[in-house]
């Protein structure tokens, strides 16, 4: 199995994604939010690029809609929830549709529509994602959402952990140089949160007193669900 990594949403070459399996990672915090919401019974998540698009969907939909997301890590005015996974509890999201717009994660998803299969991953569901990847048995591109178009340490080391989970299932992995680097960094820094504490995005969230979000997002494999983007929205994968 060939595995490569794209370091940010801005670095996505859509033509490269054709007939590939793509994994979207934005552990701080979009893919952690999506995974948590789906695990808590959310009917589906609709990832959108703009605030206006999100509000239009909510206005015109007959479904029970929750608006969630952030800009520069802050809750969007008029939205129900921010980009904190701790807000998307079963009490609030079960049976409902979440329309989500974030600075990095939803942009990475929307830039990946050419892929054959799009799965959503974070630290909280990496082992489950690895099992799904193994079943698909296709060429894999791991897309790090990054931070404002730039490389992000947190997404990169999460990619390394996902590769490590895959190695525990199968040994026939052919890694690109950047994928090898991600795996090496993880295997030498398995206490992920300690490693990324000096990262730009981590520092930004900590400055906003979001330590509980950080603590939650850096847990490994607390959820055995893999969200999948298909036909315009994200649902629980049956892979």
UniProtKB/Swiss-Prot annotation:
Keywords per UniProt: Hydrolase, Magnesium
SUPFAM superfamilies: ComB-like
Pfam families xref list: 2-ph_phosp
Coiled-coil region(s): none
Catalytic activities: (2R)-O-phospho-3-sulfolactate + H2O = (2R)-3-sulfolactate + phosphate
Superkingdom: Bacteria
GO molecular function, one term: 2-phosphosulfolactate phosphatase activity
UniProt record similarity statement: Belongs to the ComB family.
Protein name: Probable 2-phosphosulfolactate phosphatase
This protein's encoding gene: comB
């Amino acid at each position: 199995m060939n595995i490569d990594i794209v370091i940010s949403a801005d670095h996505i070459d859509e033509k490269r994604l054709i007939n590939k399996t793509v994994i979207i990672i934005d552990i701080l915090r979009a893919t952690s939010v999506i995974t948590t919401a789906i695990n808590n019974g959310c009917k589906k998540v609709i990832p959108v690029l703009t605030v206006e698009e999100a509000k239009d969907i909510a206005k015109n939909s007959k479904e029970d809609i929750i608006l969630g997301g952030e800009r520069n890590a802050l809750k969007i005015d008029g939205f129900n929830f921010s980009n904190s996974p701790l807000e998307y509890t079963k009490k609030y999201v079960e049976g409902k549709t979440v329309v989500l717009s974030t600075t990095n994660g939803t942009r990475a998803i929307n830039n990946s529509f050419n892929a054959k299969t799009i799965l959503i991953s974070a630290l909280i569901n990496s082992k489950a994602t690895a099992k799904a990847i193994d079943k698909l048995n296709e060429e894999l591109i791991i897309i790090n959402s990054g931070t404002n178009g730039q490389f992000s340490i947190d997404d990169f080391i999460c990619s390394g952990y996902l590769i490590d989970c895959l190695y525990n299932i199968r040994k026939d992995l052919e890694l690109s140089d950047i994928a090898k680097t991600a795996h090496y960094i993880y295997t030498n820094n398995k206490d992920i949160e300690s490693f990324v504490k000096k990262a730009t995005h981590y520092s930004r969230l900590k400055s906003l007193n979001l330590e509980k979000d950080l603590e939650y997002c850096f847990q490994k494999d607390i959820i055995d669900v893999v969200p999948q983007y298909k036909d315009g929205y994200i649902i629980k994968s049956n892979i």
